[in-house]
Amino acid sequence: MYENGISFIISLLICGCVKSEEMMKQHFVLVHGSCLGAWCWYKVKPLLEASGHRVTALDLAACGIDTRSITDISTCEQYSEPLIQLMTSLPNDEKVVLVGHSYGGLTLAIAMDKFPDKISVSVFVTSFMPDTKNSPSFVLEKFASTMTPEDWMGSELEPYVVFSAEFTKHRILQLSPIEDLELRLLLKRPGSLFLNDLSRMKNFSEKGYGSVPRAYIVSKDDHTISEEYQRWMIDNYPPNLVIEMEGTDHLPLFCKPQLLSDHLLAIADKFS
């Protein structure tokens, strides 16, 4: 009788430890920016996984190895469909850590508005972060007004986004390893800002998008979305947490993946 009681207690303790470990594990969902793909997280993904977490890196529509063409995608919601499908498939009791880079911030916002109860925190990595008072296109339109034609260094924005090699080298990846620059140039695909569509969309809601905890990671040496503009978005719609990264360009996931991974782990732990 006594031995059975001890065995029962030990079983409870073991089950409790296993359950505790499972609860500590996070599910990170990594969302790339315009003209990129899931491949751009190739340095960060294994670092998060090495810490024992589950990681999903998505190709959005017409990105990475997704077979669709950008000419067949007319709305930001269509573009974001792979993330929406993933969020729909999650069990109701599972919460993920959403991480969006650059234009991926708009995709995050769409998912946050639809699935606020399935997200523990959303992390905006030097990305566009909309508010709930203005049109979803507002942060893009204001950003565009800060750029001159010369600033784009021969890049195309209409009808589709194609960043020039010069812009990529000097404004996007100026601090990243040359191998990552070459990879970016080899794997580039045209994108879209979907400005017309976003300008017609309803504002993101406080009940949905606004109810999800947000963290913003500032890249201080970003020459694409400048630190000044990142801080304007932060002031415009303050997140719950702001973290700075020095010595990083527009792709800290390339130039300082370990530091970025450490920040993501700390944020996930804080909001778990």
From Swiss-Prot:
Top-rank taxon: Eukaryota
PANTHER family the UniProt entry points to: METHYLESTERASE 2-RELATED, METHYLESTERASE FAMILY MEMBER
Protein name: Methylesterase 8
Keywords, in A-Z order: Hydrolase
A Pfam cross-reference name: Abhydrolase_6
InterPro entries for this protein: AB_hydrolase_1, AB_hydrolase_fold, MES/HNL
Gene3D superfamilies with a match to the protein in the record: alpha/beta hydrolase
Enzyme Commission identifier(s): 3.1.1.-
Active-site feature positions: S102 (acyl-ester intermediate), D222 (charge relay system), H250 (charge relay system)
Organism of this sequence: Arabidopsis thaliana
Function description: Methylesterase shown to have carboxylesterase activity in vitro.
Enzyme class: hydrolase
GO MF entry, a single one: hydrolase activity, acting on ester bonds
Family: Belongs to the AB hydrolase superfamily. Methylesterase family.
